[in-house]
Curated annotation (Swiss-Prot):
Active site, UniProt feature: S319 (charge relay system)
Organism listed in the record: Mycosarcoma maydis
Residues exposed to the Lumenal side: 28-517
Single annotated GO MF: phospholipase activity
Keywords for this protein: Autophagy, Endosome, Glycoprotein, Hydrolase, Lipid degradation, Lipid metabolism, Membrane, Signal-anchor, Transmembrane, Transmembrane helix
Pfam family, one: Lipase_3
Subunit and interaction comment: Binds to both phosphatidylinositol (PI) and phosphatidylinositol 3,5-bisphosphate (PIP2).
Gene Ontology biological process terms from the UniProt entry: multivesicular body membrane disassembly; neutral lipid catabolic process; pexophagy; phosphatidylserine catabolic process; piecemeal microautophagy of the nucleus; vacuolar protein processing
Family per record: Belongs to the AB hydrolase superfamily. Lipase family.
Highest taxon, organism lineage: Eukaryota
InterPro entries: AB_hydrolase_fold, ATG15_Lipase, Fungal_lipase-type
Protein name in UniProt: Putative lipase ATG15
Annotated transmembrane regions: 7-27
Protein task: Lipase which is essential for lysis of subvacuolar cytoplasm to vacuole targeted bodies and intravacuolar autophagic bodies. Involved in the lysis of intravacuolar multivesicular body (MVB) vesicles. The intravacuolar membrane disintegration by ATG15 is critical to life span extension.
Lineage: Eukaryota, Fungi, Dikarya, Basidiomycota, Ustilaginomycotina
Amino acid sequence: MRASTHSWLLLVVVLSLSSFTVNAVILEGLIPPRSHLAPSTFQQPFALSSYLQKLFGTSLRALYGAEQNRQTSVKTFGLREAYHQGIGDKAHERARATFDFRITANDVQADQANIDFIPAIRTVRQRITRAKDPKKYVEVRGQSYRDAMCAASTELDWEDVDVEAPDVTERTTVLAFAKMASAAYKNDTSDWDGIGGFDPTNSFGWEGDGIRGHIFTTHDNDTIVVALKGTSNVFLGGGDTARRDKTNDNLLFSCCCARVSWSWSTVCDCYQGHGDQCGQTCVERALIEKSLYYPAITDLFNNVSYAYPDSQIWITGHSLGGALSSLLGMTFGVPTVTFQAPGERMAAMRLHLPLPPAKHADESPVAALPIVHVYNNADPIATGTCNGAASVCSNFGYAMESKCHSGKSIVYDTVGKLGWSMTINAHRINTLVDDVLTEDWSEKVRKKKAKLRSIGSRGGQISTRGWRWPWHRGDSADDDGDSDEDTDEDDKLAVPKARSEERCQDCTNWHFTDETL
């Protein structure tokens, strides 16, 4: 509204100034007289807009609003194919399936609740700082701790590039990515073909020894989205990679080798006793050398970029797939949107992934990464509260202790605004798609408030329970610097504002005895 008012005022100014001659402007001393101008310059028609631009500087652009400078466009995607990348001793085994746009967004009138419908994606121009040659970095770091330290100490060349990125302020864009992330769970292997001599039909159990990425493309392959499959954990229905995912989840997201209590079988031997002491270098080495997913996802990314050399790549994923997507986005500097992902910043630090240099002293390079995490705060995994000996995660052998995300996070306050209870079912991608993203957040909040008012008018009992960010320490503002009043602004938006979690801290109850990086 304010920008619109300014635009009308500016139009009045323009019309008023138009009644003056150029000579009148010269007499006021606003532009040099004719004798001070080159003849060729003075002969050009006087552009009042250029003159106003000089007067107002960049403020003229602000008066018209940012929308005119967003350079938005719309893209539609369909499911083109899927890749399966083996890991560990089966890293050479790959498979591919072609789907020929089986899931598509061609019909703009399609039912958005239909799982096979993907809404169009709106894009914006975004400047990203990324390594000039990330593939060389990945090649140098190898799979040993020593190689990773060598790569981390190597000075990288960085570049600023303007790219098309998904406009996550648009609900339908967020919904489209969520549906693509959901499609990555489809486990029909009837269409898979082996690559490099690998025959899926004669390799029992191959689905449980790798990662999967579904490839969505525009019709001209100008842009592709890689959707990585997330965790097939047993308490959410199990799946063909549940055993492998559990081991890697515990390596990636636990504070110290999944050492929840003395009765646990840990995934590494870094616990040093005294209740809360752990070896920092030890857990870094264990994650780099024992976790098989990071080298596998970089291999998958390289294979996809080789198959689509002229396409820009975006990445998405849910749960573990979202965390792995974020690690890829950090490594290769590509736009990434994740859903209900556990905090992956600690894993990125332990893996010693490269961070671009900060542009300003007060700017966080972690917050500037082209990564956006989307989750609702009723999910104990995404909020980092599914831990402790009595938690659901612990009961099934998962030590989901990390909570801090890189980039920025869009957090739907389903607990405070919609009255949801904290439950593991809120971690499901279908819960987010069906119960949150089908309409604008502002509309959902409005309907909930109207329902509460209706109950109150009939004499019913209303429970209003406040909720704060899970890493809140009791201050008057959240640890990320946003007050409760700031987050209430989300109630008026189609999608909550993306905010940094840079002040979040993981594993504050642990003491790491080596130097902490």
